[in-house]
Structures are given as structure tokens and as C-alpha cells.
A protein has these predicted regions:
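His-Asp phosphorelay/catalytic-motif detector in bacterial-type signaling
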Residues: 1, 26-27, 55-59, 83-88
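Conserved acidic carboxylate
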Residues: 8
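Conserved alpha-helical interface elements of two-component signaling phosphotransfer modules
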Residues: 11-15, 82
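Alpha4 helix (beta4-alpha4-beta5 surface) of REC/receiver domains from two-component response regulators
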Residues: 15-19, 72-73, 96-113, 117, ...
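Acidic, metal-coordinating helix/loop segments flanking the phosphotransfer/catalytic sites
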Residues: 16-18, 22, 31-59, 123
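Short amphipathic alpha-helix used as the core "switch/output" element in two-component signaling
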Residues: 48, 72-85
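Active-site residues of response regulator receiver
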Residues: 63, 93
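The feature encodes the CheY-like receiver
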Residues: 67, 85, 97
Length: 140
């Protein structure tokens, strides 16, 4: 089963995220998806993912600036569906815009993290978030 779903279109940020998770033994089963439409298909077991069992990821790390369907819409659909509402979603984005933060929380995001520009701090932020959501947090 997928533990972490990483929805990120930037290959460098995705690699840094996975490296930070791996170095903290949190990356046993990470699935990386590069656009919002594919992320929704994955979560809701549609299209190319229709054969997936309905085992939901334990954590979704979601960028906001995504091709095809943006992160806000992905968040809206996940949090408005009874089957997926309880999945912890952490926005991990370069956007520190107030409207993105407010809208994300209005839609039910569990955490909103702005990507640090410094590589070392980026890795630290991801590792701490992964540690909290995968090991410390108790989800239903």
C-alpha cells in the first residue's frame, strides 16, 4: 500500500523531498505524481489507476502550482469526499500568498508549509513534516 503520495511537478523538488524522506526512513512506499489530474485519478482509483484497491495513502504532500488541475482543486475534491476526507494533506508549496493559505485551510488542509529556498532547510522541513504525520500523528 502507498504510504505517501507526493504530488509535485518540479523534478528537483520531488527528488529533494524523496531524499529527505529516505534519509529519515520515511520513504518505504512513496508514489510521485506530476500533475493534479493524475493525482485525483490515483486517489479516487480512476483511469489508469482503476485497478488500484481503495487503500488510501497515509499522507499526501501536495504542491499548489500543478499542471492540468491545480493543487487547490485537488485539495477541494479530496476534502469534500467522504471516502478521502480523513487523509492528511500537507500543502508543500513555494506560495506564501495569503489567499492560497486561507483557501487551503478553508478547504480543510491539515498543514501548509512554504518550501524553503535553501536546500538544507527544505530537507529539514520535509523530514520534520514526514516524521510528524507518519510516526507521531494518529489518524482514523
Amino acid at each position: 500500500s502507498v504510504e505517501i503520495l507526493l504530488v509535485e511537478d518540479n523534478p528537483t523538488d520531488a527528488e529533494l523531498t524523496m531524499r529527505a524522506l529516505r534519509s529519515n526512513n520515511l520513504a518505504n512506499n512513496v508514489t510521485w505524481i506530476k500533475n493534479g489530474a493524475e493525482a485525483l485519478d490515483f486517489v479516487f482509483c480512476r483511469g489508469a489507476y482503476s485497478s488500484r484497491k481503495n487503500d488510501h495513502p497515509k499522507l499526501i504532500l501536495l504542491d499548489l502550482k500543478l499542471p492540468k488541475v491545480n493543487g487547490i482543486e485537488v485539495l477541494r475534491q479530496i476534502k469534500s469526499d467522504e471516502r478521502t476526507r480523513a487523509i492528511p494533506v500537507v500543502v508543500l508549496t513555494s506560495s506564501a500568498e495569503e489567499r492560497d493559505i486561507v483557501e487551503s485551510y478553508r478547504l480543510g488542509v491539515n498543514s501548509y508549509l512554504v518550501k524553503p529556498v535553501d536546500f538544507e532547510h527544505f530537507g529539514e522541513t520535509v523530514a520534520k513534516a514526514g516524521f510528524y504525520w507518519m510516526l507521531m500523528n494518529k489518524a482514523p
